């Protein structure tokens, strides 16, 4: 069962240079920043804000290094102001973007929710992402995980949002089990999950301790983007 670091996510069309390591990599693995009003370093997750882009690898260690080593000012050749806890800000913005993406996908018909519907999507091979509420009951999740692990191409697993957050995003109540159906929308959403995974675990640590089968084996989700 994958979560977030083994199957490659869809990559962007262009490459950029990480201002911390100097490595050239795909845009999908980077976060873009621009100098905002007052020279404040501003995250541009959609890559649409005007101004020269300052690109940093999408992980907490790289972003913290950029902030602490004055890399933004050096790259911009101008004095910039780094907001306090920039990594925390980016994490929150990425999560907000992921939840908004789920809402858009539901309106487009690319999501299905509820245990039976998710089970059917997994069995049919149409489930690209199995989205489970972080605070959902173990029993239903375990059954779906066991079903997913039996598929020739298991869906990836996302469990970084609770039932209330999922419900607000989808306009539903008590959202515990959701399937993101395979297609271009799931691929685009996966690109944002890739970036988010550099800042936050995609499943609660406690899930890895849950028994997932009659023989007592445990849920040990693999990362989906290594």
Indicate residue ranges for each PLM-predicted region.
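Short active-site oxyanion
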Residues: 52-53, 108-109, 127-129, 152-156, ...
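Short basic, glycine-rich beta-strand/loop surfaces that mediate nucleic-acid
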Residues: 152-197
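C-terminal functional extensions of proteins
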Residues: 180-226
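Catalytic cores of RNA-modifying enzymes
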Residues: 1-3, 14-20, 24, 39, ...
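Conserved nucleotide-binding/hydrolysis micro-motifs of P-loop NTPases
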Residues: 25, 61-63, 135-138, 164-165, ...
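Short helix-coil boundary/hinge micro-motifs
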Residues: 8, 17-20, 126, 142-155
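Extended interfacial segments that mediate partner engagement and assembly in macromolecular machines
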Residues: 61-140
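N-terminal cysteine/histidine-rich coordination modules
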Residues: 1-70, 74, 78
